[in-house]
Amino acid sequence: MKKVLAIILGGGAGTRLYPLTKLRAKPAVPVAGKYRLIDIPVSNCINSEIFKIYVLTQFNSASLNRHIARTYNFSGFSEGFVEVLAAQQTPENPNWFQGTADAVRQYLWMLQEWDVDEFLILSGDHLYRMDYRLFIQRHRETNADITLSVIPIDDRRASDFGLMKIDNSGRVIDFSEKPKGEALTKMRVDTTVLGLTPEQAASQPYIASMGIYVFKKDVLIKLLKEALERTDFGKEIIPDAAKDHNVQAYLFDDYWEDIGTIEAFYNANLALTQQPMPPFSFYDEEAPIYTRARYLPPTKLLDCHVTESIIGEGCILKNCRIQHSVLGVRSRIETGCMIEESLLMGADFYQASVERQCSIDKGDIPVGIGPDTIIRRAIIDKNARIGHDVKIINKDNVQEADRESQGFYIRSGIVVVLKNAVITDGTII
């Protein structure tokens, strides 16, 4: 894999994940209590022996830069690196990234200098575990110009993805990005060609692109240079290339989830607590997911009742009830709290005992969840200060609401408390 360069697309403004992307780039959003989204594709690369990795980003990249700099330091005796390339304006190109392909095009001058055979294009907001070596091996065996990683998909979600038709050799003969109505119906295929059983094929009659591509180096350079108006891989580059290039499909038959929306992000995190077998597990010694070593003390639970939950390191929980939830590092839950079906991202720092007591004496709210608070079906972002006897339960069953001045949003019925928000004593949401 020394001849492969990975390019992870950091995504746009992250509007579908807002407000989690208010102060951070999408790949820097915390996941599963201690990781960040960027750790997923980077770990997949490392486990696949791909060590040349660029991350392209445009918005709020400070925390992403910090995380990558602290986490992925390869030794000086290898060519390996993980580097963030932020959007920049130049005399030749005064514009920001206009799309996924344009992001790669603007850094082509740097990427084409590498002595590699393939570019591996990845997305920064997917949850999955994949050995890219098998993917690239298939690309080489079929002598493909481009290979797309694909999954079979059902009617309900089909219009959210790029869909394709393939022939018996696996070659892509038609491609349509997020079709609707009649255009969607035209993309139905017999997915038994992918090896599905007739029953599976009946329920999943579409072949969807995962947004993961391998390009021959010279093919990508040619496609990006010859038509500057093509700014997006899914909408323009791939459909046009399918007409006159050997574009192959590679079936990925394991768990994969696009967690680019609040609802999908929430569901994917809580699914990690499922018993006995969650759809995705971080407990895999063969292909671990890496992140920053924080050197935190073990979690302390004092008279707590915890069921079906994941609790990050360095947490302090006192006489509380935690059910079907994920708690991030340094979470602090006080006496009498009840946390149900919620994702708490934890905190970036500890408040010293003296400082906490001073805050309480002054009438301020310390970082963490105050006594006798109930949180149900919510996401609590980092460093939130939630007071005494607060109820975050979406009492009116609101589906969508923007209450930034009050420290929270509601998305798909899920209450999202902002990073650094203060929710005062007795508040009912």
Swiss-Prot record:
The keyword Protein transport does not apply. One of its GO terms (cellular component) is carboxysome. It is an enzyme of class 2 (transferase). Belongs to the bacterial/plant glucose-1-phosphate adenylyltransferase family. One of its GO terms (biological process) is glycogen biosynthetic process. The keyword Nucleus does not apply. It catalyses: alpha-D-glucose 1-phosphate + ATP + H(+) = ADP-alpha-D-glucose + diphosphate. Involved in the biosynthesis of ADP-glucose, a building block required for the elongation reactions to produce glycogen. Catalyzes the reaction between ATP and alpha-D-glucose 1-phosphate (G1P) to produce pyrophosphate and ADP-Glc. Pathway: Glycan biosynthesis; glycogen biosynthesis. Keywords: ATP-binding, Carbohydrate metabolism, Glycogen biosynthesis, Glycogen metabolism, Nucleotide-binding, Nucleotidyltransferase, Transferase. Homotetramer. Its EC number is 2.7.7.27. Activated by 3-phosphoglycerate and inhibited by phosphate. One of its GO terms (molecular function) is glucose-1-phosphate adenylyltransferase activity. CDD domains: ADP_Glucose_PP, LbH_G1P_AT_C. Alpha-D-glucose 1-phosphate binds at G162, E177, K178, S209. This is Glucose-1-phosphate adenylyltransferase. PANTHER family: GLUCOSE-1-PHOSPHATE ADENYLYLTRANSFERASE LARGE SUBUNIT 1, CHLOROPLASTIC-RELATED, GLUCOSE-1-PHOSPHATE ADENYLYLTRANSFERASE-RELATED.
